[in-house]
Amino acid sequence: MIPVSEFFPIWNSLTAVQKQRLEAAAVRKYAPAGTLLHNGGEDCMGLILISSGQLRIYTTSDDGREITLYRLLERDICLFSASCMLHSVQFDLQVSAERDTEFWLVSSEAYSALMKESAPIANFTNSIMASRFTEVMWLMDQLLWKRMDQRIAKFLLDEAALDSSDTLKLTHEAIANHLGTAREVITRLLKYFQSEGAVKLSRGAIEILDAERLELISE
């Protein structure tokens, strides 16, 4: 496990007592792939410090349609699992493990108390929040101004980079959930990509054959 101290670049700005309290508030946890860790405003489990694995942060519409907001990887911090600390945040987000994930869980009460007394912790937390909202605003730009074929092409390229593989173990339904659209739309456009020689489709998998072609589509 990555030590708690390595998640905080402001660690040396904390007092010895604050360091001790933060480490004491962190509990080692493990979540297998597919685990729902946080279900919107219903719970406030605490701050998640990811030692290994991958988390997906997403939201769900009233009709049950999902859309991925961003992913978190090793050494990232998940704030929205402790949304009760963020009084200005009024929307519900879900957090699930996409891969087997080891993490530290820091209690909301302990971290909130440290934020109130430590300017370095408060400023660091605000910088993380600003970064996440920047990612969400980028997504909004994609939703408003990008065609779906552009978004799918970009998604496939990003997934290939994330997995370091041109063969993606993804269903059309999973892509639809990430992008907030219908499975039929994904299927139609993937078949178009295949006809263009950019991808090869098989059951539960997509192989990228021409990344340059996908790059052109995504622009």
Predicted segment positions?
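Local beta-strand/beta-hairpin segments that build beta-sheet-rich folds
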Residues: 37, 69-70
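Cyclic-nucleotide recognition modules
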Residues: 71-127
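Short alpha-helix-to-loop micro-motif enriched in aromatics/charged/Gly
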Residues: 62-69
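Glycine- and acidic-residue-biased ligand/ion/polar-headgroup-sensing regions
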Residues: 34, 45-58, 73-76
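Short phosphate-coordinating micro-motif centered on Lys-Gly-acidic
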Residues: 36-42
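Polybasic "coupling" helices that flank or enter modular domains
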Residues: 98-100, 116-181
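Cyclic nucleotide-binding regulatory module and flanking cytosolic helices
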Residues: 1-33, 77, 82-86
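Phosphate-/nucleic-acid-contacting segments
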Residues: 148, 157-219
